[in-house]
């Protein structure tokens, strides 16, 4: 049956089971045993592999010394969003990949789970671990309340600045709130972590406020001593094939947002046969979640090979373990429609010739009720007065300064680094230090 899209494909119990945590937290005993596996290396490679430079051997030693709150403070010193980072960071390609335990055992210390144990311990039992410095009389505007913006705001508030965050959404948190797979972050953790950051004080925020529409860059420069741009990527790349305006095709990021904000997962429309086009984490998260929502056949189609997929091998294997089929070396050439609704996609096999990706001319079709685009997001620069762009994003120097005096930028809107929560946190932290150096 074509166009088989409906709600309530599963029972309430099945939804609860499917969206339970993928990596349950460690208890005290488990954390001690896992932490005891650490060699506490000198010049530890795991620290070098962490984008925020957390002293991993130190916080693990603090855990094994029965001081999880002290371990959390060590983590928060470098990454104030360490709780969410512990849940969503691709540790298998960062700190855990660098762990020397891999050499002999191929089983690294579970750094991510240990980090979560520590940060959860402090957030569940203690007051905010930092005190705000005396107000220094200076004001900073932050555009975007995602990881980069929250990190920058917290660091500046600690130094006595009055910070105002402007965000276009109805909640702060950015992708942590709207874009993370629901089974990776349960119990409104993103919202709780945001409240934890704000509890330091000195941070105001205005929601449903969009730069270029509700306020201008010039206005911010006039009203504040410094401006930090930490907007996310709000545009989505097109497939560049005919038929994208038909029913049944959607952006993966938009649907994931619906999942994250849904009060009842059963109210989400789910196709029986689903195609996700892309090879990154968004594609994986989309495919796994639509499968967990009751779709029978879910296929990820990527234009290059497995090694070229930006999603980690662990995440690819997780998708396959959840029943998702991944097809490589294929690109969409036509959406097949029936009565203004998508009923399939025609693909062409691809190969690399003279260093370029080309179609082979051989084609095949996959039936589908729903198709999701997950081929990358773009920075929408429709606001007047924005700094110079490079490669479609804001250009910054090594101190996160833009081409406009008094304006800094960091996170996904900037043309450097990886689009990771932990990388955005580091950008916000470094930009805050740069702003402080400039204004103090």
What are these regions (language model features)?
Residues 134, 139-141, 191-241, 334-346, ...:
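Feature captures the FAD/FMN-dependent oxidoreductase FAD-binding
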């Amino acid at each position: 049956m074509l166009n088989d899209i409906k709600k309530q494909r599963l029972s309430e119990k099945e939804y609860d089971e499917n969206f339970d945590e993928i990596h349950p937290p460690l208890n005290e005993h488990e954390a001690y045993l896992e932490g005891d596996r650490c060699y506490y290396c000198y010049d530890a490679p795991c620290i070098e592999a962490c984008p925020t430079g957390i002293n991993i051997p130190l916080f693990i030693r603090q855990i094994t010394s029965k001081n999880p709150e002290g371990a959390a403070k060590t983590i928060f010193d470098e990454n104030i969003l360490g709780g969410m980072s512990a849940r969503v960071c691709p540790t298998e390609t960062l700190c855990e990949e660098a762990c020397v335990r891999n050499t002999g055992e191929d089983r690294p210390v579970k750094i991510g789970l240990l980090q979560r144990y520590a940060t959860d311990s402090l957030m569940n039992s203690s007051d905010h671990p930092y005190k705000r410095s005396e107000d220094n009389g200076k004001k900073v505007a932050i555009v975007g309340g995602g990881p980069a913006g929250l990190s920058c705001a917290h660091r500046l508030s600690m130094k006595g600045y009055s910070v105002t965050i402007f965000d276009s959404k109805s909640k702060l948190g950015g992708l942590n709130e709207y874009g993370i797979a629901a089974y990776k972050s349960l119990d409104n953790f993103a919202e709780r972590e945001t409240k934890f950051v704000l509890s330091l004080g000195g941070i105001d925020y205005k929601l449903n406020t969009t730069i270029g529409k509700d306020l201008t860059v010039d206005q911010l420069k006039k009203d504040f001593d410094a401006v930090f741009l930490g907007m996310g990527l709000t545009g989505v790349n097109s497939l560049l094939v005919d038929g994208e305006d038909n029913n049944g095709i959607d952006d993966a990021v938009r649907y994931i947002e619906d999942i994250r904000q849904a009060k009842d997962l059963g109210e989400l429309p789910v196709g029986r046969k689903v195609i996700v086009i892309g090879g990154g984490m968004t594609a994986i998260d989309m495919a796994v979640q639509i499968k967990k929502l009751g779709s029978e056949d879910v296929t990820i189609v990527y234009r290059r090979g497995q090694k070229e997929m930006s999603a980690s091998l662990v995440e690819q294997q997780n998708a396959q373990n959840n029943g998702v089929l991944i097809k490589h070396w294929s690109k969409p050439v036509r959406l097949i429609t029936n009565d203004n609704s998508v009923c399939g996609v025609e693909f062409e096999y691809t190969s690399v010739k003279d260093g370029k990706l080309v179609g082979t001319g051989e084609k095949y079709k996959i039936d589908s009720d729903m198709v999701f685009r997950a081929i990358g997001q773009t920075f929408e620069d429709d606001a007047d007065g924005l700094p110079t762009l490079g490669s479609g994003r804001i250009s910054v120097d090594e101190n996160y300064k833009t081409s406009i005096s008094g304006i800094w930028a960091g996170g996904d809107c900037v043309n450097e680094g990886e689009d990771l929560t932990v990388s955005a946190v580091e950008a916000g932290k470094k930009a805050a230090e740069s702003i402080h150096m400039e204004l103090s």
